[in-house]
From Swiss-Prot:
Stretches the record annotates as Alpha C-terminal domain (alpha-CTD): 253-340
Keywords, comma-separated and alphabetical: DNA-directed RNA polymerase, Nucleotidyltransferase, Transcription, Transferase
SUPFAM superfamilies: C-terminal domain of RNA polymerase alpha subunit, Insert subdomain of RNA polymerase alpha subunit, RBP11-like subunits of RNA polymerase
Oligomeric and partner information: Homodimer. The RNAP catalytic core consists of 2 alpha, 1 beta, 1 beta' and 1 omega subunit. When a sigma factor is associated with the core the holoenzyme is formed, which can initiate transcription.
GO terms of biological process kind: DNA-templated transcription
HAMAP family from the UniProt entry: RNApol_bact_RpoA
Gene from which this protein is expressed: rpoA
Alphabetical list of Gene3D superfamilies matching this protein: 5' to 3' exonuclease, C-terminal subdomain, DNA-directed RNA polymerase, insert domain, RNA polymerase, RBP11-like subunit
GO molecular function, one term: DNA binding
Alpha N-terminal domain (alpha-NTD) as annotated region, ranges: 1-238
EC number(s) recorded for this UniProt protein: 2.7.7.6
Protein name listed in UniProt: DNA-directed RNA polymerase subunit alpha
Domain of life: Bacteria
Amino acid sequence: MADTFVAKNWRDLIKPRRMEVDQDSATPTYGKFVAEPLERGFGTTLGNSLRRVLLSSLQGAAITTVKIEGVDHEFTTIPEVSEDVTDVVLNLKEVLLRMHTNETKTLRIEAEGPKEVKAGDIITDPDTEILNPGHHICTISEGGKLRMELTCRRGRGYTPANVNKVAGSPIGTIPIDSLFSPIRKVNYQVTNARVGQVTDFDKLSLEVWTDGSVSPQDAVAYAAKIIKEQLTVFVNFDETEEPVVAEAPKEEAKLNENLFRSVDELELSVRSANCLQQANIKSIGDLVQRTEAEMLKTKNFGRKSLKEIKEILAEMGLSLGMKLENWPPKQAPAPAQPKA
């Protein structure tokens, strides 16, 4: 179990209120996300980590091999087809897929000229979608025929052609390079954020471009989940045994008589007391329902005042950010009678 004082290493840090999405610029393939406030340095730490995971670790689908009827290798031509095999393979690499299964699938193209063959001409099954059906693959002349089989699967990152080569494949099967990542580009920027009178916080702005097989918002969520799962091995204690006052049962919070005391009884510094008075916080019950971010927005209220109040509340078994239903109560509890 984590020691109470050790737990302050992470519980005392400011957390971002939420992740905001720029709805004005959002598209199915682009998203801009903003998280603030963050402790100084956390903007770069989180931004760089999310960027690396987004670009390297998210799964996608891609074509891995192609077999063209009448073709034995990629360094040749196809009768009545304008593009040679190398050009056709290059065009197939840019076909965007979405797969709803982890199984390897075989797709087909069966076309006769004259015709411009596009990605939309690929014959799929219910588990596979073509996301860019207008993408050009090749052009067949009058009298020409094209038959090909395409193998596709899910994966992550980049896989070179030699890795996609499967032992025992029929002669004429051509392995191709596969870019599985659904992420096309990621940018992040860290700027200053203000919380009340304090300006030494970070604001993280993250821009994500995808190929359309996953939404930018889902991509960020998946990346954050990957980071979270990878970091759990470094936590060498069980925090579930540590009681968190802010999440205590509401019945216990109501029975804490300190909630009904005036904040004047806290013996705060003059600055802190004036800030509470200015914010119209009269009782400790009013105080504990304020979050750290809300307190820091109070004029002249800084980190020193925040630390002072948190330490005093902790001695009472209370904390900021508590949720008290039906506050203030209609009738405060009677003061405890002295023992005989």
